[in-house]
């Protein structure tokens, strides 16, 4: 398998087809605005985001985690708030899709169809890895620019602190998946 990484420019996006974006090291909000704009401008374009767990949220790690925990538990009800809602995602792929959804006009047909054309995955799925030639795009404007005293955390770290059981289950599945991927690559 041949993996090529290229910078992605919104003016050079194809009008139709599929674009795979590697989210590793990107700031979540910046990448989400870029993707939302591309989905709205090109109605026949599908965007696949991989490595969503490596997206970055800037800010103090404790502050970000406490904000997520407060958002999850702030709805006080007499019965189970998880059944009633609002539903707050915990997994990185769902968190990112929710961020993009917030930037789309989800009540209109264009926004709903744009959201249907977005796929977000944690790590890279096997069906994408098995392609002969894989082009992963990066958005230079959305990459994290490291500077002194910059504080940030990844969505995976947030998920690990919010829901450690689900994170541990996913981590074990990734190890099994990695072994299968090595077998596919070698044989």
UniProtKB/Swiss-Prot annotation:
Gene Ontology biological process terms, A to Z: negative regulation of translation; translation
Keyword Ribosomal protein listed: yes
GO CC terms, sorted: cytosolic large ribosomal subunit; ribosome
Gene3D superfamilies: Ribosomal protein L13
GO molecular function, one term: mRNA binding
Family annotation (Pfam families): Ribosomal_L13
Record-linked CDD domains: Ribosomal_L13
Top-level lineage group: Archaea
The protein's role, per its UniProt record: This protein is one of the early assembly proteins of the 50S ribosomal subunit, although it is not seen to bind rRNA by itself. It is important during the early stages of 50S assembly.
Assembly mode: Part of the 50S ribosomal subunit.
PANTHER family xrefs: LARGE RIBOSOMAL SUBUNIT PROTEIN UL13, RIBOSOMAL PROTEIN L13
Family: Belongs to the universal ribosomal protein uL13 family.
Name of protein: Large ribosomal subunit protein uL13
Source organism of the structure: Pyrobaculum aerophilum (strain ATCC 51768 / DSM 7523 / JCM 9630 / CIP 104966 / NBRC 100827 / IM2)
Lineage, uppermost ranks: Archaea, Thermoproteota, Thermoprotei, Thermoproteales, Thermoproteaceae
């Amino acid at each position: 398998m041949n993996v090529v990484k290229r910078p992605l420019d919104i003016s050079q996006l194809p009008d139709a087809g599929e674009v795979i974006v590697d989210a590793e090291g990107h700031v979540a909000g910046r990448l989400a605005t870029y993707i939302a704009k591309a989905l709205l401008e090109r109605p026949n374009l599908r965007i696949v985001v991989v490595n969503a767990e490596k997206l970055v949220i800037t800010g103090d790690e404790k502050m970000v985690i406490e904000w997520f925990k407060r958002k999850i538990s702030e709805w006080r009800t007499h019965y189970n708030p998880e059944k009633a809602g609002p539903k707050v995602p915990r997994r990185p792929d769902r968190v990112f899709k929710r961020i993009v959804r917030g930037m789309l006009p989800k009540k209109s047909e264009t926004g709903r169809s744009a959201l249907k054309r977005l796929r977000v995955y944690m790590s890279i799925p096997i069906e994408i890895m098995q392609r002969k030639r894989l082009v992963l795009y990066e958005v230079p404007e959305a990459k994290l620019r490291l500077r002194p005293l910059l504080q940030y955390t990844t969505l995976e770290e947030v998920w690990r602190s919010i829901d450690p059981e689900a994170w541990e289950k996913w981590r074990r599945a990734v190890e099994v998946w990695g072994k299968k991927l090595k077998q596919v690559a070698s044989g």
